[in-house]
Amino acid sequence: MSKATIELDFLGLEKKQTNNAPKPKFQKFLDRRRSFRDIQGAISKIDPEIIKSLLASTGNNSDSSAKSRSVPSTPREDQPQIPISPVHASLARSSTELVSGTVPMTIFYNGSVSVFQVSRNKAGEIMKVANEAASKKDESSMETDLSVILPTTLRPKLFGQNLEGDLPIARRKSLQRFLEKRKERLVSTSPYYPTSA
């Protein structure tokens, strides 16, 4: 039983020509731009893993003759025959990653992006080291924050009560009068200030 080759036009490049009348040059230019835009739109919707596998499979056929390149090749067993939707793409990627043994690891650091191919064990170790370093940094920042906060909270003094020695006597008395008047104003304008009966 022979296998029939079926070619599907996923990109929609082969449009049916209804009229065979010659087109003006400008119309040909517009059609060319439209078809290029259609190709870009279709390629942007395809899963990147499928494109990579297609490019890899065409790279393997580069030693064959030009005659065999014009005929569509039959898909191999390990390649998906139908494009996988993005929802199921993670399932397909995980199976290919298990075979290869390495996974891409993207690191964002100091404004730069780096991608490395590392094994799963190595990626886990890197993540563990990064988490430990981040937790140590958080603990050290908490210790410094507490050292700044605790001395001020251990001294529960109101503003204006510890003015001896900092200012000259005239300023000190003036500032104390100002703070007393301010305190009276705040108390008198509070919503729960008891009115005299």
Curated annotation (Swiss-Prot):
One Pfam family this sequence matches: Jas_motif
Top-level lineage group: Eukaryota
Locations listed in the record: Nucleus
Keywords: Jasmonic acid signaling pathway, Nucleus, Plant defense, Transcription, Transcription regulation, Ubl conjugation
Limits of the Tify domain: 98-132
GO MF, one example: protein homodimerization activity
Any one GO BP annotation for this protein: defense response
Record region (Disordered): 57-84
Residue ranges annotated as motif Nuclear localization signal: 170-177
Compositional bias of kind Polar residues: 57-73
Acetylation keyword on record: no
InterPro entries registered for this protein in UniProt: CCT_CS, TIFY/JAZ, Tify_dom
Residue span of motif Jas: 168-193
The record's account of how the chain is modified after translation: Ubiquitinated. Targeted for degradation by the SCF(COI1) E3 ubiquitin ligase-proteasome pathway during jasmonate signaling.
Induction section of the entry: Up-regulated by jasmonate, wounding and herbivory.
Its biological purpose: Repressor of jasmonate (JA) responses. Interacts with and suppresses RHD6 and RSL1 transcription factor activities to negatively regulate jasmonate-stimulated root hair development.
Domain note: The tify domain is required for dimerization.
UniProt cross-references to PANTHER family, sorted A to Z: PROTEIN TIFY 4A-RELATED-RELATED, PROTEIN TIFY 9
Family from the record: Belongs to the TIFY/JAZ family.
Designated name of the protein: Protein TIFY 9
Organism: Arabidopsis thaliana (Mouse-ear cress)
Gene designation per UniProt: TIFY9
